[in-house]
A protein has these predicted regions:
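Beta->alpha turn/N-cap motifs
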Residues: 27-31, 186, 203-211
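Glycine-centered hinge/linker elements that transmit conformational signals in sensory
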Residues: 108-109, 152-182, 225, 229
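Extracytoplasmic "Venus flytrap"/periplasmic binding protein-like
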Residues: 1-57, 91-100, 192, 196-200, ...
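Hinge/lid segment of periplasmic solute-binding proteins
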Residues: 28-80, 106, 132-136, 160, ...
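Short helix-loop capping/hinge motifs at secondary-structure junctions, enriched
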Residues: 88-98, 147, 174, 250-257
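Short glycine- and hydrophobic/aromatic-rich loop-to-beta-strand nucleating segment
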Residues: 81-85, 141, 245-247
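Extracytoplasmic/periplasmic solute-binding protein
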Residues: 70-76, 81, 103-154, 198
Length: 368
């Protein structure tokens, strides 16, 4: 076994040396694209299509894992980002229905904010490497019709993107967002929620597991509703977090590797396995919608709802292989969340932050 923190380093070393390369690896789109232009994974399109014919994939998982009309890994499961809501705080403010749009979330968050008592509506940070909240803000941007790239891979950020910067800064200035949120890392949002400081938090279902597994959070759990994220004025596209299995191009028996992956997708075994790891990961097949594990449990159902709508990806809606690669690789330099941070902290206005972000992405684009 290899620790997750060591996996990529050891895999890269094996690939470079041409020795001890695994036949099958756990993969996702970002991991695959980071090897462009020398992607070391086989094209497994035929296997994915065969699986889809026998047991149809959710459309978002089927389309969202395709790279330049090919599959470099077989989709297996997906994580999600769910909305955790303090229902007791909403009730105290006279709010009787859960919000379904971003505008409603922001309005409700403003109503429940009480900064004098260190309570805030939104747990959305913009620290320098806060990838969790960058994904949330990016998704909000998509939902409002804003994009960093066009389909051809050109940087296409416009006034819809600056509107997102300005909205975040407005919420921050109005103290709907904690004032330390500009320094958060990826754990800042869920940390604030667990500490009872925030009413709305967008996080993986691991936050739900933390609430369930620790007795100290019993009251917080009882007052928490877990939902799929809201829709925007333009769409309700979610970021996809599909993962699966890739066959390396050094594999000497690709037929056997395909058989192993097919075995792991055997319906009975797969369904029982997914039941054990719910709701942190959700299935990627259409028939999951009729499975009681994912239909009758409210939190599991919301996780599956997320996966059903998770057709977005880094760079969405770019279609080209190089464009997808630039988007996937630039993500790890965080120019987007840095721009949000600049506007929130007043070190740049939205136009200046947009210009700086665009320049950073274009410089990176030239290196790919």
């Amino acid at each position: 076994m290899v620790a997750a923190t060591d996996f990529v380093t050891k895999l890269n070393a094996a690939i470079e040396a041409g020795q001890s390369v695994p036949d099958i690896i756990s993969a996702d789109t970002t991991k695959v694209l980071n090897y462009y232009p020398n992607i070391p994974c086989n094209d497994v399109t035929d296997l994915v299509d065969q699986i889809d014919e026998e047991r149809p994939y959710l459309q978002a998982s089927y389309e969202g894992t395709k790279i330049d009309d090919k599959y470099y890994y077989v989709p297996f499961y997906s994580s999600s980002t769910l909305m955790f809501v303090r229902k007791d705080k909403l009730e105290e403010a006279g709010i009787t229905e859960m919000p379904t749009t971003w505008d409603e979330v922001f309005k409700d968050a403003e109503k429940v904010s009480d900064p004098d008592n260190d309570f805030y509506g939104l747990a959305i940070g913009c620290g320098e490497n806060d990838d969790d909240d960058e994904n949330t803000i990016r998704q909000y941007m998509w939902n409002e019709g804003g994009y960093l790239f066009d389909e051809d891979g050109n940087v296409a950020a416009d006034d819809k993107v600056t509107a997102v910067f300005d909205k975040y800064a407005e919420l921050y200035d109005d103290k709907v967002i904690p004032q330390d949120a500009t320094t958060w890392d990826a754990g800042g949002n869920n940390g604030s929620y667990l500490a009872g400081r925030t009413a709305f938090c967008f996080n993986a279902p691991t936050l739900y597991n933390a609430l369930v597994s620790d007795e100290q959070y019993k009251d917080l759990l009882d007052n928490t509703v877990v939902l799929a994220p809201p829709a925007g004025s333009d769409n309700s596209v979610y970021m996809n977090f599909n993962r699966g299995f890739a066959v390396m191009n050094t594999c000497k028996d690709t037929d056997l590797a395909s058989d192993v992956i097919s075995y792991l997708l055997d319906k009975d075994w797969y369904d029982s396995y997914m039941e054990e790891i719910a709701p942190v990961f959700a299935p990627v097949f259409e028939d999951a919608k009729e499975n009681t594990t994912w239909k009758d449990n409210e939190v599991n159902a919301q996780a599956l709802k997320y996966v059903e709508n998770a057709s977005g990806y880094y760079g969405y809606p770019v279609k080209t292989l190089k464009g997808r690669t630039v988007a996937a690789k630039h993500y790890f330099t965080y120019p987007f969340v840095k721009a949000v941070n600049q506007v929130a902290t007043g070190t740049a206005d939205s136009a200046g932050a947009l210009k700086s972000m665009t320049s950073a992405i274009e410089d990176f684009q030239d290196q790919v």
